[in-house]
Amino acid sequence: MPLLDSFKVDHTKMPAPAVRLAKTMTTPKGDEIAVFDLRFCRPNQEILSEKGIHTLEHLFAGFMREHLNGEGIEIIDISPMGCRTGFYMSLIGVPKNARVLEAWRRSMEDILTLKSEEEIPELNIYQCGTACMHSLKEAQEIARTVLDRGISIMDNEALKLQL
């Protein structure tokens, strides 16, 4: 089985919160696709709470689209990592890391402005597979931690595993 790109980086060296351009590819029609690693916490040292990451999944995708889409960039998907240390974001176009960082920072600020769980999009049994597993408080704690620590940009060369 081929080794996936995400397993070719040394997770012990990953800073967090941090942005990493994980992969780029070109479709047969010539569209550029980018995948970003948005690492919220240090692998094997911290983990995002299940309610917090689930609520972030509902909020983060919308706020990131508000702040990042445009000028040849369109988010395809933002999904939580199985290890619960961050999210992968797939896009049409390849924005600069600094632009992604700024959109992420602004999204965390947006999350802190919410007053109640009624403001969480698609939080109902018809649109969410586990509607009872949410916590705005935990999502806001994660957002506050990201802002307090500051977001950096990862260096792919420094993270490359010597296989």
From Swiss-Prot:
Q: What organism is listed for this UniProt entry?
A: Wolinella succinogenes (strain ATCC 29543 / DSM 1740 / CCUG 13145 / JCM 31913 / LMG 7466 / NCTC 11488 / FDC 602W) (Vibrio succinogenes)
> What PANTHER family does the database record attribute to this sequence?
S-RIBOSYLHOMOCYSTEINE LYASE
Coiled coil region boundaries: none
Q: Which gene encodes it?
A: luxS
What HAMAP family is this protein classified in? LuxS (MF_00091)
Stated EC number for the protein is 4.4.1.21
Q: Which cofactor does it need?
A: Fe cation
Tell me, what's a Pfam family for it?
A: LuxS
Protein's recorded name: S-ribosylhomocysteine lyase
EC supergroup of this enzyme: lyase
Reactions it catalyzes? S-(5-deoxy-D-ribos-5-yl)-L-homocysteine = (S)-4,5-dihydroxypentane-2,3-dione + L-homocysteine
Subunit-structure text = Homodimer.
SUPFAM superfamilies attached here?
A: LuxS/MPP-like metallohydrolase
GO BP of this protein = quorum sensing
Cofactor annotation comment: Binds 1 Fe cation per subunit.
Q: Which GO terms describe its molecular function?
A: iron ion binding; S-ribosylhomocysteine lyase activity
Q: Which Gene3D superfamilies match?
A: S-ribosylhomocysteinase (LuxS)
User: Keyword annotations for this protein?
Assistant: Autoinducer synthesis, Iron, Lyase, Metal-binding, Quorum sensing
Q: Which family does it belong to?
A: Belongs to the LuxS family.
* Function recorded in the entry: Involved in the synthesis of autoinducer 2 (AI-2) which is secreted by bacteria and is used to communicate both the cell density and the metabolic potential of the environment. The regulation of gene expression in response to changes in cell density is called quorum sensing. Catalyzes the transformation of S-ribosylhomocysteine (RHC) to homocysteine (HC) and 4,5-dihydroxy-2,3-pentadione (DPD).
The residues that hold Fe cation are H54, H58, C128
Q: InterPro entries from the entry? A: LuxS_sf, Metalloenz_LuxS/M16, S-ribosylhomocysteinase
Which domain of life does this protein belong to?
Bacteria
